[in-house]
């Protein structure tokens, strides 16, 4: 950008007075040397000069400053504004959706990274080991999901089971059985805080619903065989995916249905919510 015609230069200081002749001399001796390199060398040489050697240049700078003040009494130094720093190339100038930044940087998704940090901490599973072993990554992700759906004690057991099962070649198969055990223990444990607000008959049904869903998902991912659905024991409107055989085993309770006729009393154990029975 060209300077205006009425631009007034600053008065030279002692270093500028000394380096004016030295710069010209050094540029003639080294025609290929860049101006910035010349300035560095001149600055180093100026610092090596003694006070007696600098004194004539200091006096000359004072004389030039006094002359400058007489010629331009209204002069005021106005430094140039520095240009605003541009955004870095590796930063996004717009909001990035969740997980997109990791894909752009060739990193694992944040969900897998969080599962590696939290779920694998108990069993000594680091992020590097999870990236190199898909089975350990799946076990850590299942343990992270268990902390969301199960109570605290069951979540700790799920994390321990996932860490223990991650070392063997059949880790996913073992994880399915471990999740089934955890689901049964969580259904008999403490009640979930949101079970009653959703109209479930008790905390056991809600815990069994979440436990069966997690166990079925883990088993289906491991085996990949025949899958079908069972009615939820807590709410018959929901179907739980299952990976067991086509015929239910003796341990599974078959779905029950009650027909209410006039004159008949309500059964003592009602597995369905009152609203669903009224709809029948």
From Swiss-Prot:
Supply the InterPro entries for this chain: HMG_box_dom, HMG_box_dom_sf, SOX_fam, SRY-related_HMG-box_TF-like
Q: Which GO terms describe its biological process?
A: brain development; inner ear development; inner ear morphogenesis; negative regulation of DNA-templated transcription; negative regulation of transcription by RNA polymerase II; neuron differentiation; positive regulation of transcription by RNA polymerase II; regulation of cell differentiation
Broad class of where this protein is predominantly found = nucleus
Q: State the tissue distribution.
A: Expressed predominantly in CNS.
GO MF, one annotated term: DNA-binding transcription activator activity, RNA polymerase II-specific
Gene3D superfamilies recorded for this chain? High mobility group box domain (1.10.30.10)
Pfam families, alphabetically?
Answer: HMG_box, SOXp
Tell me where in or outside the cell this protein is found: Nucleus
UniProt keyword terms in alphabetical order: DNA-binding, Nucleus, Repressor, Transcription, Transcription regulation
What PANTHER family would the database entry show?
SOX TRANSCRIPTION FACTOR, TRANSCRIPTION FACTOR SOX-21
Function, please? Acts as a negative regulator of transcription.
Record-given protein name: Transcription factor SOX-21
* Species whose genome carries this gene: Gallus gallus (Chicken)
